[in-house]
Amino acid sequence: MKMRVVSFKAEEDLLVLLDRYAMKYKLNRSEAIRKAIENLVKDEVSEGTVARVEKILLW
C-alpha cells in the first residue's frame, strides 16, 4: 500500500520517549509512530468503538 506523508506537532518529552522506544526495538521514528497508531486503531476496532475500514469503504 502506498504511504503518504503526515505531519504533526508533539511535545519534546513525547519525542524523547518515542525515540527511546524506537531505539529499544530498532525502529526509526516513522516506524515507531506507525506501530503506535496501528495498535491504537486495532484496539478501538476490537472494542467495537471504531468502524472497520471495510464498512467505511462501502459507504
From Swiss-Prot:
SUPFAM superfamilies: Ribbon-helix-helix. GO terms for biological process: regulation of DNA-templated transcription. InterPro entries: Arc_rbn_hlx_hlx, CopG, Ribbon_hlx_hlx. It holds the Pfam family RHH_1. This is Uncharacterized protein ORF59b.
